[in-house]
Every structure is written in C-alpha cells, then in structure tokens.
Amino acid sequence: MRFAISIPQFFGDGEFSPADFRAYFERAEAFGVYESAWAQEMTLGPSPQLAPLEAMTYAAACTSSLRLGCTVFVTTLHSPVQLAKDLATLDQVSGGRVEAGVGSGGPRRPFAAYGIPADRYLARFTEGIRLVKALWTEPSVTFDGEFWQLKGVAMEPKPYQKPHPRLWFGGSAEAAVRRGVRLCDGFFGAGSSPTAAFAAQVATARAVVADRGQRVGFGPGEFPIAKRVYIAIDPSDGSRARQRINDALARMYGHRVPAIESAAIAGTLGECAEAVRAVIDAGAEMVLFTPLFEVPEHMEQIATELIPQLA
C-alpha cells in the first residue's frame, strides 16, 4: 500500500509563507511514509491557489526522494507542446521524480478565457495526449492532427524517466474511465467521487486493463489505481471535523458542493481510519490525503497516527 500527501496550494487567509512551504516538504519527506506529493489545477476561482507546475518545481528543490505530481492537469487548456517540454524539464531537474495526471476538465471549463473553443474538447484531449507522448519518446516528430501539426521537429531533452513519466488519468464517467485506461498508465479517482462510485470506476478500469492483457499494480508494465481523499481529523469531535471540511470545500469552490462534501472523509481518528480502509478495499493501491485546513498538522497526524492504523 502506498500513501501520498497533497501540496498545500491553498491559503484561504491570503497569506503565503515561502519558509513554511519549504518546511512542509522537508517534513513530509522526513516522515518516510509519503511516497509522493500532489498538486491540483484550478487556475481561475475564488480561492487563492498556487499554480501546480511551479509548486511542483519548488517542491523538487526542497526534497531529494519525494515524487511529485499533479492530479490533474486540465490538458485541454494547455499547449501539449509546452506541457511536454515543461514536464520533461522538471523530470530532468528532479532526477526522474515526476508523475503527471491528465484530464479533459469537462464541458464547463472556462475555455473562452483561454481563447480555446469549447467544442471538440474530448478530441482535443485525446490528440493532445498522443502528441505529448510522441514528443517524449520520438527523436523526430511529424504529427498531422486536427488541432496540432508538426513536421520533423525534435524536443530535447527527453524526460529523465524512460520511456516517460507515468501518465495518470483522472475522470469519473464510465466512458471517460475507459478512454483514460486506453490512453494513460494509471487511474486516479477524484476527491469528488464517493467510495461507492470509485469502486464502480475501479471495476470499469480493471475490465479494460484485463482486456489489454495487463495487470493492475505498480510493477513494470502494470496499471496502478489511486484515489484522492479530502480529509479532516478531529480527535474529540467528528461532527466538528465534518463542518470544517465542508466549510473549506465551499471556500475552495466558491459555493457548497454536496456531492464533494459527501465524498470527503471527516471524523475522529478511528472514523477516518475506517473510511480510508473502505477506499482501499474499493481498489485504491495509493491514497492521496488532501487536508484543507491546518495542513501541516494534518500531514503529521496522518503520518504518525492514521497510516500506522492502515498498515
């Protein structure tokens, strides 16, 4: 079983401390129980949030072994050429520690703010992933797509990891999960997916993986499955933990989102351990813990008190 912790991108009080940011990564790595740290992407919105790629790069400079990822980059809003270059660069300077989560973002993303037409976003997503992989693996790329065209171009350096960093797909609808398994190297359940819904997504992913002649797992050639978990622990008052995480989610999204609130895990230590075990039983081989308040304190409590109960 593997465990990960979120990169603390949110600072609801508007105050950001670079020193605290560095200390967080150093402390997370020192615990030795977190394999990786993950950002998420929300460029526009009501809550102050650091950009994922830059936060990952800073984290790489503060650590030596912690793997670094984003779940997910909304790749329909990115140039695949620039994203391929940026992630290859970070993989080089971090010594091969990059994990890349990708997703289409859905039809309600602010495409107009990026000067991108909203129609054909799924085709744009699929084509973009194909182009990223080509730039990462081929010495010279000729690509004649609907959205991007390249003729005999090279992108160097390639990523440090060979053939390339693992591409995780993030999505929830059955068709999206099937598409993601075909395109990517791992499935990452969203923090907004309740455990029962995640279990159904895992079943879909496993079926497609089996049809492709693969196995689920973290071994060579295998297809891993993970899940983000929004979490709040209160040693003495589980209802207070629930209220606080619901308030934090409302600040992050700008309004109450009952579906996401129902997917979050909150309560006493014992209640949280039981709920996380259910996520593991549903098929998660890695759990990404995402506290939204008192983040350094939660990171330490999860490492020293919660994870030992799950081992």
Task: Please tell me what each predicted stretch does.
Residues 26-30, 56-65, 87-98, 181-182, ...:
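Acidic (Asp/Glu)-rich catalytic clusters
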Residues 1-62, 163-165, 292:
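N-terminal beta1-alpha1-beta2 module of alpha/beta enzyme domains
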Residues 76-183, 213-216:
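Internal, glycine-rich beta/alpha segment that forms the wall or movable "lid"
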Residues 15-29, 83-86, 169-179, 267-278:
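Short, acidic/polar
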